[in-house]
Each structure stands twice: as C-alpha cells, then as structure tokens.
C-alpha cells in the first residue's frame, strides 16, 4: 500500500466557512485544482481563486433548491475510484480522480437549538450530499484525504510541504477516523431530535414530545487517558462533549500541576458546580465529591478562610473552587495553610500563579467566566442500562418559601437558610447542612438515615468549636420523623429549611414549634446519589 499520495485535485464544500479561503489559497498555491459547490464556490471565486463549479464538471446542474448537488457518478467515482485498479473505467467515463475532499455539514444542531425551529427547518438542514462524500472519501482513505475539521487545515498544508505535495497514509487514516466520528455524531443528533418527537406523531400531548428520544445516541471525544480510574486496578479515560460553551472542568485550561486524575476531575466538577450557585464571592472546598466547607463573603480570601474553618481536617488534600479571580493573597493563604490537590477559578492573576508555581504538584485550572447555566442531561450508569434525567437546575428564592411554623425566621436566619439550601443540593443524600453567617459550620453527608446526618453535622461543628446556636439547617429531602428536628434543636439550630411533603409533616412542624424553631418549606427536593 502506497504510503504517500499527492494531492492534485480537491473538492471543497463547506457549511462553516471559517478558514476555508486561506486553506483553498494554500492548496491553489501548491498547484492543487479546486472543485467546489454553491456558496463555497462563489466565495472562492470572489476571492480570486481559480475554481471549477461541480455542476460545470458533471454537466449536471444543482437542483431542487440545492438538495441535489454532488450526488453524481463523476463526483463519487472520482472519490471512490481505486488508483491503479479503476483507472480504465474512470478514463472511459471521463471521471477525474479527486484526491482530497473538504466538507463540513449543514448546521443541524444549531438549527434545532433555535427557538421556534419548525420541523420543516430541521428537515431542510439534514445534509445528504455532504455525509455521502465524507463516507466515500473515508472509505477510500488509501487514496483520498477527507478533511472535516478546520483545525486540521494548517497541519495538512505543513505535511504537504514536507512531502512534496503529498499526504502520508497514517494521516489519511487518522482523517478518515475523524470523518466517521463526524458523520456518526451528526446522524446521532438527527436520530435523537426526531426520536424525541415520536410521541407527538402518535397523537400524544406536546408535553410528551421533545423530552427523551426513543434511542439515545451519545458522542463524546476523548480528552485524555489516565493512569488509572477510581481505583488503581481500573483503567480510565476522560471524554468530553463537543462544542460545550459553559465553563466546566471539561473546558477548563490547566495552567500548572500534574495530570488530573479520575477522582480529581470528579471532585473538581462537584466543587465548581456548587460554587456557581452563588452570586457573592464564594469558596467551596470538596473532598470525595462532597462539600466539606462553603462560605460567601466580601472577598474570596475571607470566603476561603471561613470555608476552611468548617472542617480543616477534611479540607486536607481537597479541591478548592472560587467564583472570582484567584488573587495573590488568597493563593498565598492556601499554599501556606494546607495541602491542596486542585484549585479552580474563572481566572488567576499573574502574581497568584507565581505563588502557586512554588508548589508544582498543585493543579491550577482556569475555567473562564460563566453565564446562565445551560439545561442538559445527567447520566448514571447501571448494569445493563443508563439512567437519564434533566440536570438539577432547580432554584428557590425567598419569595417562594413557605413558613409553616408559628415563628417567622429572622433576616439572618433566612439568609443562612437560603445559603445552606444551595449547599445541600451538592451534598450526597441524606444531606444535612448547618450554616451561620453565610458559612457552613457542619455538614452531614451520605448517611442512610437523615437523623444521623443531622447528628454528624452537629458533631462536626462541635469538633471545630463553631457555635451552632442561632444557625440554620438545610435538609435535601423531607424529614420522615421528628427525630432530625430534635437532634438539630439539641445542637442549637433555630431555623430549618426543607422540602416538606412527608406524611408526618404535621408531627415534624409540631416538633419545630416545641423547640421554637422557624421552619421553611421549599416544595423542591434535591436528592443526590
């Protein structure tokens, strides 16, 4: 099998035209003949490039509003023709060999994401000719290079320059794999979109449509291999979604430190998603996927100091997330005080990075600023299947709370209640969070009975010498019995925020009244397993 194949003729037909003019200019300057279609051909001609319209080459016009452009034997014969084997038949039918195909597909995902997108709009943005050319070229990668990503343009030109206008087989094979991945992802988007509309076509309500497709197709791109997974005997890799805009651990840039481990990524995600809940300067410290300290304040330095005081023992070797730029003073406080695995923030000052550089093992991630959190899906793998649900983006404001006890909360109790309610959303169930003056003072996580989570939160606060009297307590789900309220009262809690909804709500409310506790119902649960 010939390793090198010269590129003498290229067919360019792209929806996303970023970089295509420069790439075409580079190809033309190296003697490559250009074929093109529709808008791509017009753009190249406007830029003064010598380009042949595919319709002129085939002798067959584009038709049906562009639905039929490249579906022609002179196009696909030129792509699929096996060099040295099909030469005679290609010559007989005046089929020119096409050595490179540059294609990206109609923007189906962007179209269906637009508000008010109709079924007709979606249908017209299903590319037919593009995927057909992509698959043809990828199949014949022995002779043809297929380019579906503009990020590959520069590398292709460099390789051609290094190989007298040719591309190596290894490169053509790699490009073919990218092409098959590209068409697989494209078809998956289409199948998912139309699959979600099946209920509507069976006469079900509009609410039934647009939710979950009949068949779920997922495409993720491998970002990195890892030394091991959750445990050292497990192999692992990190895959990310393409074109994610929201600030996340997947899109963050690592500016220093060792490679992230499986557990680092999971814990950093938990910390970052929690800190996003707060508008004020905030710090979240996470250990084993649970917050062990959270605080908001006027500065991230004070927020860090207060979050750390919740549970210094658990903070050792933890993950620290901020929702403001990491400054030098805060970086110095962290490095001087504790061992930390990861620090993640929207940005970091030069002075802060100079300080963290003294501890090269500390991983520092910059995630960028975030706007509104985007809806999406959460997945949980079970043996033989996958649980899928909407992301938990539920929030509750003060105006939505219901006071169900005789006593109303004070302004500070209410602030603390809303604060610890946000934290409880990110604590493993059963979750109990004690908070006072905008900082956590005790967190009980992951217990099988809610009362023990309440007791553990009280123990944590006592161990650190933090005063519970006058604090607020959040519970991620309702109290099935009054014992959790009794435990909180014994610790000194004076305000409770919880979803409500237990068959024993009256008993629980009565317990709160007995202890003089103000109780707020959110009517929203935040289980986290």
UniProtKB/Swiss-Prot annotation:
The modification N6-acetyllysine is found at residue 287. InterPro entries: AICAR_Tfase_dup_dom_sf, Cytidine_deaminase-like, MGS-like_dom, MGS-like_dom_sf, PurH-like. Residues 1-148 form the MGS-like domain. Its EC number is 2.1.2.3, 3.5.4.10. Pfam families: AICARFT_IMPCHas (PF01808), MGS (PF02142). GO terms for biological process: 'de novo' IMP biosynthetic process. Pathway: Purine metabolism; IMP biosynthesis via de novo pathway; 5-formamido-1-(5-phospho-D-ribosyl)imidazole-4-carboxamide from 5-amino-1-(5-phospho-D-ribosyl)imidazole-4-carboxamide (10-formyl THF route): step 1/1; Purine metabolism; IMP biosynthesis via de novo pathway; IMP from 5-formamido-1-(5-phospho-D-ribosyl)imidazole-4-carboxamide: step 1/1. Keywords: Acetylation, Hydrolase, Multifunctional enzyme, Purine biosynthesis, Transferase. SMART domains: AICARFT_IMPCHas (SM00798), MGS (SM00851). One of its GO terms (molecular function) is IMP cyclohydrolase activity. It catalyses: (6R)-10-formyltetrahydrofolate + 5-amino-1-(5-phospho-beta-D-ribosyl)imidazole-4-carboxamide = 5-formamido-1-(5-phospho-D-ribosyl)imidazole-4-carboxamide + (6S)-5,6,7,8-tetrahydrofolate; IMP + H2O = 5-formamido-1-(5-phospho-D-ribosyl)imidazole-4-carboxamide. One of its GO terms (cellular component) is cytosol. The IMP cyclohydrolase activity resides in the N-terminal region. Belongs to the PurH family. PANTHER family: BIFUNCTIONAL PURINE BIOSYNTHESIS PROTEIN ATIC, BIFUNCTIONAL PURINE BIOSYNTHESIS PROTEIN PURH. This is Bifunctional purine biosynthesis protein PurH. The gene is purH.
């Amino acid at each position: 099998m010939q390793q090198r194949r010269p590129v003498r003729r290229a067919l360019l037909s792209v929806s996303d035209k970023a970089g295509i003019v420069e790439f075409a200019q580079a190809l033309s300057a190296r003697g490559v003949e250009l074929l093109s279609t529709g808008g791509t051909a017009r753009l190249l001609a406007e830029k003064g490039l010598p380009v042949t319209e595919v319709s002129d080459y085939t002798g067959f016009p584009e038709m049906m509003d562009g639905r039929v452009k490249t579906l022609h034997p002179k196009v696909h014969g030129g792509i699929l023709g096996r060099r040295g084997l099909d030469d005679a038949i290609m010559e007989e039918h005046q089929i020119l060999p096409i050595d490179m195909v540059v294609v990206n597909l109609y923007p189906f995902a962007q179209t269906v994401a637009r508000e008010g997108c109709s079924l007709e709009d979606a249908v017209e943005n299903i590319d037919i000719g593009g995927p057909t050319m992509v698959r043809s070229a990828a199949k014949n990668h022995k002779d043809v290079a297929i380019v579906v990503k503009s990020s590959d343009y520069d590398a292709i030109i460099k390789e051609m320059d290094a190989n007298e206008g040719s591309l190596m087989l290894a490169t053509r094979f790699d490009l073919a794999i990218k092409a098959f991945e590209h068409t697989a992802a494209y078809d998956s988007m289409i199948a998912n979109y139309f699959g979600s509309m099946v209920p509507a076509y069976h006469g079900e309500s509009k609410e039934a449509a647009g939710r979950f497709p009949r068949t779920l197709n997922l495409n993720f791109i491998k970002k990195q291999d890892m030394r091991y997974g959750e445990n050292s005997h497990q192999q692992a890799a990190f895959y990310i979604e393409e074109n994610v805009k929201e600030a996340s651990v997947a899109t963050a840039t690592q500016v220093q430190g060792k490679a992230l481990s499986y557990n680092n990524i999971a814990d950093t995600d938990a910390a970052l998603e929690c800190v996003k809940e707060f508008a004020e300067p905030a710090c979240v410290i996470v250990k084993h996927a649970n917050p062990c300290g959270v605080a908001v304040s006027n500065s991230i330095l004070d927020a860090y100091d207060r979050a750390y005081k919740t549970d210094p023992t658990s903070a050792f070797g933890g993950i620290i997330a901020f929702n403001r730029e990491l400054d030098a003073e805060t970086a110095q406080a962290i490095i001087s005080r504790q061992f930390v695995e990861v620090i993640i923030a929207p940005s970091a000052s030069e002075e802060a990075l100079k300080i963290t550089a003294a501890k090269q093992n500390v991983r520092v991630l910059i995630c960028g600023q975030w706007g509104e959190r985007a809806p999406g899906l959460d997945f949980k793998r079970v043996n033989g299947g996958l649980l899928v649900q909407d992301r938990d983006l539920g929030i509750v404001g003060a105006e939505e709370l219901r006071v169900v006890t005789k006593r109303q909360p004070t302004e500070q109790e209410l602030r603390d209640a809303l604060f610890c309610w946000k934290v409880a959303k990110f604590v493993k169930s059963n979750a109990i969070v004690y908070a006072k003056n905008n900082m956590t003072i005790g967190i009980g996580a992951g217990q099988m009975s809610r009362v023990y989570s309440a007791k553990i939160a009280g123990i944590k606060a006592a161990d650190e010498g933090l005063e519970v009297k006058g604090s607020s307590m959040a519970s991620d789900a309702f109290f099935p019995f009054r014992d959790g309220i009794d435990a909180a009262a014994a610790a000194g809690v004076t305000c409770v925020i919880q979803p409500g909804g237990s068959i024993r709500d009256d008993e629980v409310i009565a317990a709160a009244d007995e202890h003089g506790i103000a109780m707020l119902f959110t009517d929203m649960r935040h289980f986290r397993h």
